[in-house]
């Protein structure tokens, strides 16, 4: 599964090279409780060399269906110049999986949009169920000692000594045995 990604927009060819933009992202954090991933993203100028720059405007960045940046202002772009950057929060499906799409566009040497690009990535699934393991340590005719452990997604462990008629909860929010 992807932890980062990037794409280049289509190119505008000039005498001194192809001009385009590069969109890049990387995971900042994942939150199990909220079932969401936060990514860092950036949009940068690319394709020029040395002191060359180009005018570009009508920028737009869409991440997971949400417009995170939009500007009609025309600016001078050198290779590596950051047009915009930020974070975006992406909600996962109820089973913890998520594939998201990002797109970017701009007008390079044009007022109208003439360079576009997009990409799609599958994020690491966020666990939506806890894992508990157990084993019998010892037993007698009247007692049994059970070893158990849980992962960090488990808050409470419930057990029954009467075949499910009543249950006892143990706070295991620290995920320890």
In which residue ranges do the predicted regions lie?
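Short beta-strand segments within Ig-like beta-sandwich modules, predominantly Fibronectin type-III
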Residues: 168-175
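Proline-enriched interdomain boundary motifs that mark the N-terminal boundary
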Residues: 127-136
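Short, solvent-exposed loop/linker segments at the N-terminal edge
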Residues: 28-34, 135-142
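Asp-box/BNR beta-propeller loop motif
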Residues: 163-167
